[in-house]
């Protein structure tokens, strides 16, 4: 039994840690009917649907085709580096940070494999993760905490953008500078086939399913309908692709939902955070995000402060730091870990270093303005 647990923890360390943390919090908050409301089924279903569609894109050769197209347009390694980081940065503003990462991280890993630039995979995926988290703070729909605070404080567009756009602008400049050295100036010439094969019929279907996911992200189509349609479509087209979905990632999210919600119900934790808010709302929001993630931090702290500007900035800046500061970061980690020969220790080291630098930069900027 113990050997099985050790094997599982080696294979799924993130889920293992999340499950242990969830179990610990259960001793402080005994299971009751409130547990039924912990799980954000919309988020889980969207993640499932997007992972299935991305698997479909990979199966029909779409990423390989897109790689060839991109390399025809962009010849410089530095231009490609900046482009790969800016894609999730700007797309996250419209489709949220987790969706942007689910789209662009698999594509980037495939592209760097094609270019024989595997050493660049860790820094590039880390920068894409930071970019998606920081780009998403620009708009009310970019991430869940923005949407919640925008509604909770009944903010106007001008008020909101006055806080987020300066931070976004600084992030843009810093990310471009950080991206430049990731790939060599001149990309190595690769012998490529004269055009990747593309199953166009199925590609059209997967593209339509992807569009359905985006409509669900924008809350135009209910997530239940999208989930049913996508499951039915894959059962008819290629049911084996449903096995490509990372169900362990979904379970990891469930565990962290339990952790964050239970911490929010512990009176000692709530009282401690309230006392900190009175001293410094910005730093409290950043600190709380490191422990319980930025979305629960926004929900937990908002009733105790009217300093929404600092809270809004804090939970967005606080998405940098630990891997759970923004749960979207777990997506990148899991996608990278699924690669053959993944170096998880190095990934976490680079991830932590990049996040701490970004966190320090944006905190310093926030305190100056």
Question: Which positions does each model-derived feature cover?
Answer:
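Short helix-coil transition sites and intra-membrane helix breaks within transmembrane domains
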Residues: 55-61, 91-103, 135-143, 286-301, ...
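C-terminal transmembrane helix pair
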Residues: 161-172, 283-369
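Structural signal for alpha-helical transmembrane segments and their membrane-water exit/capping regions
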Residues: 3-34, 46-61, 180-185, 212-240, ...
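Core mid-bundle transmembrane helix pairs that form the ion/substrate translocation pathway
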Residues: 160-240, 348-361
């Amino acid at each position: 039994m113990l050997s099985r647990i050790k094997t599982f923890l080696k294979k799924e360390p993130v889920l293992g840690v999340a499950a242990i943390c969830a179990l610990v919090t259960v001793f402080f908050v005994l299971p009751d009917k409130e547990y039924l409301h912990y799980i954000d089924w919309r988020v889980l279903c969207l993640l499932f649907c997007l992972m299935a569609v991305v698997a479909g894109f990979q199966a029909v050769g779409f990423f390989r085709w897109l790689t060839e197209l991109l390399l025809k347009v962009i010849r410089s390694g530095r231009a490609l580096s900046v482009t790969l980081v800016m894609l999730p940065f700007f797309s996250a503003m419209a489709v949220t940070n987790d969706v942007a990462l689910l789209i662009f991280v698999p594509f980037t890993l495939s592209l760097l494999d094609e270019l024989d630039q595997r050493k660049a995979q860790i820094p590039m995926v880390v920068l894409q993760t930071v970019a998606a988290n920081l780009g998403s703070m620009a708009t009310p729909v970019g991430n869940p905490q923005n949407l919640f605070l925008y509604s909770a404080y009944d903010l106007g567009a001008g008020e909101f953008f006055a806080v987020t756009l300066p931070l976004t602008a600084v992030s843009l400049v810093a990310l471009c500078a950080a991206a430049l050295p990731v790939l060599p100036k001149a990309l190595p010439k690769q012998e490529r086939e004269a055009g990747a094969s593309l199953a166009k019929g199925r590609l059209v279907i997967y593209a339509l399913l992807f569009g359905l996911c985006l409509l669900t992200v924008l809350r135009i189509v209910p997530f239940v309908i999208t989930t049913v349609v996508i499951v039915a479509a894959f059962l008819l087209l290629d049911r084996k692709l449903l096995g490509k979905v990372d169900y362990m990632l979904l379970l990891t999210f469930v565990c962290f939902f339990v952790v964050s919600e239970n911490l929010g119900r512990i009176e000692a934790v709530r009282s401690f955070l309230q006392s900190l808010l009175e001293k410094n709302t910005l730093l409290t929001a950043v600190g709380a995000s490191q422990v319980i993630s930025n979305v629960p931090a926004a929900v937990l702290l908002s009733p105790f402060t009217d300093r929404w500007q600092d809270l809004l900035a804090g939970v967005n800046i606080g998405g940098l730091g630990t891997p759970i500061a923004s749960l979207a970061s777990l997506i990148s980690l899991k996608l990278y870990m699924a690669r053959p020969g993944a170096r998880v220790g190095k990934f976490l080291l680079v991830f932590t270093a990049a996040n701490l630098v970004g966190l320090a930069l944006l905190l310093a900027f926030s305190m100056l303005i």
